[in-house]
UniProtKB/Swiss-Prot annotation:
SUPFAM superfamilies: Photosystem II reaction center protein T, PsbT. It comes from Salicornia europaea. The chain crosses the membrane at residues 3-23. It is found in: Plastid, Chloroplast thylakoid membrane. Belongs to the PsbT family. One of its GO terms (biological process) is photosynthesis. HAMAP family: PSII_PsbT. Disulfide bonds: none annotated. This is Photosystem II reaction center protein T. PSII is composed of 1 copy each of membrane proteins PsbA, PsbB, PsbC, PsbD, PsbE, PsbF, PsbH, PsbI, PsbJ, PsbK, PsbL, PsbM, PsbT, PsbY, PsbZ, Psb30/Ycf12, at least 3 peripheral proteins of the oxygen-evolving complex and a large number of cofactors. It forms dimeric complexes.
Length: 35
């Protein structure tokens, strides 16, 4: 069960960092169609 908690924390941290970098930089990716 501890592994699930650590995985959740890891994903949450990566998600926060990803969103922080994504919102900090200008959204150039939205101009192109990314699939």
């Amino acid at each position: 069960m501890e592994a699930l908690v650590y995985t959740f924390l890891l994903v949450s941290t990566l998600g926060i960092i990803f969103f922080a970098i994504f919102f900090r930089e200008p959204p150039k990716i939205q101009t192109k169609k990314m699939k």
